[in-house]
Regions:
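Repeat-solenoid scaffold signature
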Residues: 1, 128-198
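Short, small-residue-biased leader/transition segments that mark boundaries at the very start
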Residues: 3-8
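Conserved blade-ending motifs and adjacent loop-strand segments that build the rim/top face
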Residues: 10-19, 23, 64-71, 113-126, ...
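Conserved beta-strand position repeated across blades of beta-propeller domains
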Residues: 30-32, 74-76, 126-127, 169
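Short coil/turn segments that connect the beta-strands within blades of beta-propeller domains
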Residues: 36-37, 80-81, 132-133, 173
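Recurrent small/Gly-Pro-centered beta-turn motifs in extracellular repeat architectures
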Residues: 43, 86-88, 139, 179-180
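A short loop-to-beta-strand structural motif that recurs across blades of beta-propeller domains
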Residues: 47-50, 57, 97-101, 108, ...
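Short, solvent-exposed loop/turn segments at conserved positions within beta-propeller repeat blades
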Residues: 91-96, 137
């Protein structure tokens, strides 16, 4: 049977169908929970696009960073203009964490990584469904928590093993964690975390409700 041939960097190779030879590929798509016509698309080459009309027209809103991968996109459940991106460059031997945030539909971006270990590249970011500005970040070496919209991050490992976090989902006041090689974990009842997000860090003692 005759095999299909394709050319990469001017050298013919056999397309074995595994997909490793494919690049500039859409890697993540996120629909806004506020408007079904607003959709974000991120690619494995770092490009980000947005459509405001259900896919008829797209605009390039790529952050001004070196080439990397858009690993996940999360639209804020509280503000339709706010979106978070987990961006990484580990394939370029850059393991720094990149949590990107835009508050204007991707017109401008800012990196938020204060407190995240320098070699813990980020795979996923989610905002809490109840508390605005309460963020969870899944990294290559565990989970981080931010109570101030990403300005500062704290390690939130608890009894979770040191393992890559591949996805996060807030579901019915629980945080569901998908890991690479260690199964699924669930942080049951986020109520104390919601309460903690309202506590000033200047207070030495806080009594939680029981």
């Amino acid at each position: 049977r005759r095999q299909r041939q394709m050319c990469i960097r001017d050298s013919p190779i056999t397309n074995e169908g595994a997909g490793g030879e494919v690049y500039h590929t859409i890697y993540y798509v996120a629909e806004s929970p506020h408007d079904k016509d607003i959709i974000y698309a991120g690619a494995d080459d770092g490009l980000v696009h947005i459509t405001m009309d259900g896919g008829k027209n797209w605009s390039n809103i790529t952050p001004d960073l070196e080439e990397g991968m858009i690993n996940s996109i999360d639209v804020s459940p509280h503000d339709p203009a706010t979106v978070y991106i987990a961006f990484n460059r580990y394939k370029f031997d850059d393991f720094k964490p990149y949590v990107l945030k835009s508050s204007n539909y991707g017109k401008t971006w800012k990196v938020y990584n204060n407190g995240i270990e320098k070699n813990s590249f980020v795979r996923v970011v989610r905002e809490d469904n109840v508390k605005k500005g309460l963020l969870y970040a899944g990294t290559e070496r565990g989970i981080y928590l931010s109570t101030d919209g990403g300005e500062n991050w704290d390690k939130w490992q608890r009894n979770l093993p040191i393992v890559p976090i591949t996805d996060l989902k807030v579901h019915q006041n629980d945080l569901v964690v998908a890991t690479q090689g260690r199964g699924f974990w669930i942080y049951d009842d986020l109520t104390p975390i919601h309460e903690l997000s309202e506590v000033s860090k200047d207070k030495n003692v806080h009594m939680f409700e029981v």
